[in-house]
């Protein structure tokens, strides 16, 4: 192996001159060591007019551990406080927090940088995260105990906003077990400076004080200037200056070809005479039902409600999700989504097929109040209404709230868009959680005589009989068969599952229609029991 290029830093000289500071991720702190080299990176911020002074030498203008608040004391007995310890205009970006071995040390990222980009720290993953205009996570900083890297775009935007430059300090040590003579080399001492970097490089004999096996030592030390984004313009966060608008299918022409039109509301007509002859803002755009899978599958981030989908508090989209076959969104509303989200919706765009649902028409056009008739949305609305009404009437919950670890079942409950067995099993599990597992057995037991080994549904059957609910057998049959279907995903699909599958006619109806029918039946039972419960109040069993 020829050690000369390695010890002369041929690779690093080219790297410093060209790529250092211009890659997608910039290492702003590192202290690592391997068998043959030691790597050190650090950084600091300086004003542009201080750069020439800093490039007069290769020394680091800020040492690791420095840059903390402090005082300067003067001969006349006065003193002055400095935010970063002195008045040389050098500002730390990575702060080494050390507590003299009494507490764990750690690296702290500039508070102003964190606040500027509103970064969230995920300490478990060792990353700082920003939210893009779609509400999606973007890793901005990656940290380990020995390395900190920053995404270049976010760093350079920050530098531009501050009107500052970054000095990226570097120091590499390399060594060899061969002497200079054995390597065919001589001592070297080189200094190099350009407009944006300066370094010193040398190769010398190593006396072997700390490690006798090392006979040759090489070092390169210096700094490079990283500037902010050119022509940086801060965003107002709500303007149109960077928005992109996708075209969507809005109909067909006389030959049956698809007609597309932009979702930019500035090019759409409205009821006030804007852009006459253009498609209206309220032109319905049709999408496959499967467009909603993304939102149902991530309930921690998204919330699907009757007529809306929400991404936390970041954005929302008005939609018609009461339609039997499609999800429908007005053309102008699509333009309010981020471009990334528009592209997602566009991939599910289909030709118009009729109009909006009756529910959406009555609400949006006629201005009437209308309950949704979409099975999952209707079930959720009636389930909440039932629980509230029951609690007000009786003072206790018939269906207890979901456990925190099960709350996602509520957000993911929907009618599957396809005949997917796993998706079907997930919806069955969600319904079983809500209607069977969360039955308040303790309260129900106060009104009946509980037999040996009687469980939730059996107790509930006795309770319904005790209060004289006329449709109790229909309700209990529904719950028993729902529990039977649940035994499929929960266990092995055995006899109980087969019996329930036959009851709900899974083979004849298909999985999606079966869930739809199950939700409709469950909703009907809640409405009947809710209405009945307001008429009668059972007396507690005295036995």
Mark where each language-model region is.
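Amphipathic alpha-helical interface elements
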Residues: 2-318, 332-481, 514-521, 525-543
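Histidine-centered, metal-coordinating catalytic motifs and their short helical/loop contexts
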Residues: 473-502
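Acidic, Ser/Thr/Gly/Pro-rich intrinsically disordered interaction regions
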Residues: 501-509
